[in-house]
Amino acid sequence: MAKKKAFTPLLYLASLVFLPWWISLSFNKSLESWVTNWWNTRQSEIFLNGIQEKNILEKFIELEEILLLEEMIKEYSETHLQNLRIGIHKETIQFIKIHNEDRIHTILHFSTNIICFVILSGYSIWGNEELVILNSWAQEFLYNLSDTIKAFSILLLTDLCIGFHSPHGWELIIGSVYKDFGFVHNDQILSGLVSTFPVILDTLFKFWIFRYLNRVSPSLVVIYHSMND
């Protein structure tokens, strides 16, 4: 009976790790045909944001420049001009296909992530008892560590998250999350998030040391500051 009680939280933890991957895979497959059909029948009513409109205009300006170039080379044979028109037509069709695939990818991934969040939230509420047991295990494990190891772990974690080289890591993490939701890449938004998110974390961490660690374990705070200096 005791082994079963100990095994249940571990099984719940493993399900929390693999459940998002399974949800993403299954819903991507099941929603793909529906989203594709919906986009192909309703795309004329979809509002494009400024970035999408800019990308579309840039592509069509390139095609317009090619057409102007065509007007400048009238002396070429009719066969050559006909091939040029066919090439422009094919490029236009290819561009429209790429645009449709990008929009379908955005809608599909955003919908899947929302569904995944809702399911995981409900699953966490349903498994509240297992989460309490896992939390008690984690607290017991941390309590048994020495203050030196705790201080070293905190220092390592803070250097990774808010250290000198952390913006490069945050750029990759935020960029991957941004891409996973299917949003259009925007350097200004990513740069703003990368420059502000570590600062917010640093402020919260210092507040946590001031309010919690100073009260619970003053010796740990002393060791941490000694190692940090």
From Swiss-Prot:
Location of this chain's protein in the cell: Plastid, Chloroplast inner membrane
Coiled-coil residue windows: none
Catalytic activity, as annotated: K(+)(in) + H(+)(out) = K(+)(out) + H(+)(in)
GO BP term (any one): potassium ion transport
Membrane topology per record: Multi-pass membrane protein
Keywords noted in UniProt: Antiport, Chloroplast, Hydrogen ion transport, Ion transport, Membrane, Plastid, Plastid inner membrane, Potassium, Potassium transport, Transmembrane, Transmembrane helix, Transport
Regions crossing the membrane: 7-27, 114-134, 189-209
A GO molecular-function descriptor: antiporter activity
One Pfam family recorded for the sequence: CemA
Keyword Transcription regulation: no
GO CC terms, sorted: chloroplast inner membrane
InterPro entries for this protein: CemA
Signal peptide: none
Function: Contributes to K(+)/H(+) antiport activity by supporting proton efflux to control proton extrusion and homeostasis in chloroplasts in a light-dependent manner to modulate photosynthesis. Prevents excessive induction of non-photochemical quenching (NPQ) under continuous-light conditions. Indirectly promotes efficient inorganic carbon uptake into chloroplasts.
Family: Belongs to the CemA family.
Protein name (record): Potassium/proton antiporter CemA
Protein source organism: Panax ginseng
